[in-house]
Amino acid sequence: MSPTPEWVMVGGEGPESYKQHSSYQRDLLKAAKDKINAVISTNLSLNLISNRFSVADFGCASGPNTFVAVQNIIDAVEEKYLRETGQNPDDNIEFQVLFNDLSNNDFNTLFQGLPSGRRYYSAAIPGSFFDRVLPKHSIHIGVMNYAFQFTSKIPKGISDRNSPLWNRDMHCTGFNNKVKKAYLDQFSLDSKNILDARAEELVPEGLMLLLGSCLRDGIKMSETYRGIVLDLIGASLNDLAQQGVIEKDKVESFNITLYIAEEGELRQIIEENGKFTIEAFEDIIQPNGESLDPKILAVSLKSAFGGILSAHFGAEAMMKAFELVEAKAHQEFSRLQNAKPTMQYLIVLRKN
C-alpha cells in the first residue's frame, strides 16, 4: 500500500487551477469582513499594535484568497488604530505578512499575484502548519482559511482491508461509527498540534482566526453537499476500477486527509486544548451557495483534488475520473440540490 501523497492544490493560472476555482472560499472571506472588523476591534489590544505588525496565513495555497484574508485583517487593524489613537497608521505601522504552505505549493503563482497596491512586506514560509514554522512570539494575528479541516495523515487501519477500521469510502462519510471515531481521534490530535504550535508563535494575547466549514451537530458528512461530491469522486474511481483502468486495490486503499468536524467537536477540541479563549464562533452566511452546474462542479473539484488523484492513480485516470464526476453530477442533481447545509464559520481565538 502506497502512502497518500501530500495534498497540494493545482497550481498555475490555467482554466483548471485552484486560482481560477476558489471563489466559494473567497465569498466566505468577503462575507466575513464586517465580523472580522468587529472582533479585531473588540479583542485586539491596542498595546499589541506596534511599529511592526505581523500577520501569517497558514495553508495559503496559490490562489488569490489569501490576499483577501490578510487585507481584511490589515484593514481592521488600521481602522482600530486610527479610531483609538487619531494617528495615521501609514505613518506609524509597517505590516509584515507571512504566507505558509507546504514546500511544493506553487509559491511562484502566489507571489506573481501579489496586489500592486499592498501596504505590507511579504515572505514565504514553507513547511507543515501541523508543526512550528515561525519563531516564538513572532506574529500578532494568524489566520487559517479552509485549512483547519485537514489531518496530517490517514488514521491507522483506515486503508487496510484486514483492519476492522477499513474504510471502503475515500472519506469519512459519518455512517460508520468506528471510522468516524478514528478520523475524529486523528483530527483531535492534529488540531492540538496546530493550536500548540500557533500558541508558541503568537505574541501574548495575539489572535488566531479560523474560517471554514463544519457540520451541524448530528449531521453526517455524506448528507451534505460536500460529502455527496466526495461520494461522486469515489464512485467514479470505482467505475474506473471495474473498467480495468486503475487497480481495485489502489481504489480501496485510497482515503483523503480531510475531516469535517461537527460544531460541538470543534468547540470541545479548542476548549480542551486550553491555550486559547474562544472570543467568537460565528455562523457566516455564504451569499452564493454551492454550484449545482455539473461542469463547473467537476472542474472546481479537479482544482482541489486533481493533484492528489493524479499522484495516486496517474494523470490520465484522474482526467477520466472527473469526466465521470460531471456525468454523475447530472444524475445526482436532485440529491445535491436537497443536501443538508453545513455551517460556514469564523472562529476567533485569543491566546491565553
UniProtKB/Swiss-Prot annotation:
One record GO biological process: methylation
Record's cofactor remark: Binds 1 Mg(2+) ion per subunit.
Cystine pairs: none
Residues that bind Mg(2+): N167, E252, F254, N255
Keyword Nucleotide-binding among record annotations: no
Family annotation (InterPro entries): MeTrfase_7 (IPR005299), MeTrfase_capping (IPR042086), SAM-dependent_MTases_sf (IPR029063)
Binding positions (S-adenosyl-L-methionine): Y18, G59, C60, N65, F99, N100, D101, L102, S128, F129, F130, N145, Y146, A147
Cofactor needs: Mg(2+)
Amino-acid positions noted as binding substrate in the UniProt annotation, renumbered to this chain: Y18, H21, S22, S23, Y24, Q25, Y146, A147, F148, Q149, F150, S300
Protein name, as recorded: Paraxanthine methyltransferase 3
